[in-house]
Amino acid sequence: MGSENVNAAGTNRKHILDVDVLSEDEIISILDQTAAMSEVLRRDIKKVPALRGRVIVTLFYEASTRTRISFEEAGKILSADVINMSSSGSSVDKGESLLNTGLTLQAMGVDVIVLRHPYSGAPNLLAKHLPKVSIINAGDGLHAHPTQALLDAYTVRSKWGSLNGMKIVIVGDVLHSRVARSAIWAFTKLGAEIVLSGPNTLMPVGLNLVDGRANVLPPVSVQPDLDEAIRGADVVMALRLQNERQNGGYLPSLREYIRRWQITKDRLSSASKEVLVMHPGPMNEGIEISTEVAHGGRSLIEEQVTNGVALRMALLYQVSAGGYQIEEEHP
């Protein structure tokens, strides 16, 4: 599996840059591997030697809690040496470019770089120029967040068994959401129907194009009226309002957004009786989603966080280890 191959110096490294180039079979392979990693997390001793001797660097140019920590935990459970590197306090503060930082890490013998960056395409840049290092995209600008989309797909599949024929409603700030872009690819490749809902000002123009490329998205419908969009939904995913990425003028008022697009118990009454509720986090509780729903019986939000560790274990394992046997670490 993997999204892109780089062949150099006799190596064949694979990168996870986005979901759009993954086939359905590749996605299913990742989700199956995630299930195996979930079993590891249920063991009394949560440690396996699969990546012993491998060096993983988490290189984050943006703040993160869930993604960074889950990657670090995933690497350590697999017995890799994990180095946490942020832009502050490093040579980046002195003006070093991303590429030069990557080349330095490659020269040090790093095996995997997990990169979060404010500029779209930054992981692709490293993948192109670092033949000896595997790159995993942990979120780049407004472009993509493949690991979040894959863990969300796994979370739904673990509940329903399949996404085929399901109606999934994604609500909120789609325009600024890299999660939504990757989720649309993941969910539709697995057979789900996607409905987007939110203010027209927060819906991207030209939904059938991704970053101007000729990659046509599978059918996606837009229904600004959330009460209409949610009818018969199997899954409802709320997106965070990306205040740090907005220049203002997208919403008439926060009160209006809450009134029209907050996920509430009353609104969910028109969805499927078994509807599941998700949020990729961080969550503005009481804005995108009511407290009652966020912590209610239909919420998968905590499971998303738990599954994030297993999914990232699976990705680190697949880009680093190939066919190594997952065995339990004995003290």
Where would I find each of the regions flagged by the language model?
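Phosphate/diphosphate ligand-binding glycine-rich loop within oxidoreductases
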Residues: 45-154, 285
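Phosphate-coordination loops involved in phosphoryl transfer and adenosine-cofactor binding
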Residues: 51-56, 164-168, 274
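Rossmann-like adenosine-cofactor binding region
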Residues: 208, 212-292
